[in-house]
């Protein structure tokens, strides 16, 4: 295994009808065109911004250096997690994602289980996660036809730093008032059940096939482990929150795990160095990848910083 140096990825701004034209204060990004609703942080078109791999897309890096990059999380050779920021100014559709079995039934490699970490949440912010107990598929169909589907969904209040699990098969929705860091299987399979009168295509047959009336979706309490908090540890991913301080030892954040590690800076900024490479900064709302083969990686915070560490799991 050759030694790959860590690298920062450039974000990929994606247009969505429910997004914003100005992403301040999160990004210095304005557009007079279609609004931006998603910022992909590990999308296949995200390019390395630092080090020997600078200019190469994550798709190219994974194809050319798969085992060195992913290590024991190599799986099928595709980068295993898609990580995004969501900026909803309006309601997203009420939607559901398939599990692996259903996705593969229709020729796709994997389904879509995800989790949401609230980087910010305004007063009264909430999301819809799952169907209320006792509701039947016939009632759901009637709710779609009468534009009252929201009344049948479980509404979950959301505060800053909350973690929510959204397993495949969970009917869910999101609206304004939140900024979400989403970690998901690398899949963009979404079946819309209801879209608030907008003209986008609905996928009712597949939605009802994918939907489960009872799931494990919901808010996950953090678990303190030594110098960090485990926000969620599930089949496809583990997400941790590290509060870095120059006066405290946080060397565990960069210890090798045998697989790829992903660091997202939620607050403050950090600097990453490793053997045989030039150190580079990672600022707020930026993401860095630590390949499985990187040697002697050191993460330094000159002042207080909050870093979200994400590690894929190979199911």
Predicted regions and their residues:
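Short, basic/aromatic beta-hairpin or loop at an interaction surface
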Residues: 134-146, 258-271
């Amino acid at each position: 295994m050759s030694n790959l140096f860590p690298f920062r990825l450039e974000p990929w701004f994606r247009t969505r009808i429910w997004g914003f034209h100005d992403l301040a204060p999160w990004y210095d990004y304005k557009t007079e065109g279609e609004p931006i609703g998603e910022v992909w942080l590990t999308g296949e078109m995200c390019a390395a911004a630092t080090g020997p791999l600078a200019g190469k897309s994550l798709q190219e890096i994974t194809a050319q250096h798969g085992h060195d990059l992913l290590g024991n999380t190599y799986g099928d050779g595709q980068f295993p997690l898609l990580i995004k920021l969501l900026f909803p100014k309006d309601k997203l559709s009420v939607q559901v994602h398939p599990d692996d079995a259903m996705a593969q039934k229709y020729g796709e490699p994997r389904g879509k289980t995800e989790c949401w970490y609230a980087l910010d949440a305004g007063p009264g912010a909430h999301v819809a996660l799952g169907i209320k107990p006792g509701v039947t598929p016939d009632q759901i169909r009637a709710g779609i036809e009468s534009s009252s589907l929201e009344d049948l969904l479980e509404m979950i209040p959301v505060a800053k730093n909350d973690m929510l699990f959204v397993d495949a098969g969970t009917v869910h929705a999101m609206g304004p008032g939140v900024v979400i860091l989403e970690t998901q299987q690398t899949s963009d399979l979404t079946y819309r059940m209801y879209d608030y009168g907008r003209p986008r295509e609905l996928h009712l047959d597949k939605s009802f096939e994918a939907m489960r009336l009872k799931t494990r979706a919901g808010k996950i309490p953090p678990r303190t482990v030594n110098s960090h908090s485990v926000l969620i540890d599930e089949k496809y991913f583990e997400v941790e929150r590290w509060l870095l301080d120059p006066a405290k030892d946080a060397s565990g954040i960069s210890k090798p795990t045998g697989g790829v590690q992903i660091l997202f800076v939620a607050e403050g900024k950090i600097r990453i160095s490793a053997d045989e490479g030039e150190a580079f900064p990672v600022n707020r709302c930026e993401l860095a990848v630590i390949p499985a083969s990187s040697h002697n990686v050191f993460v330094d915070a000159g002042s207080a910083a909050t870093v979200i560490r994400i590690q894929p799991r190979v199911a």
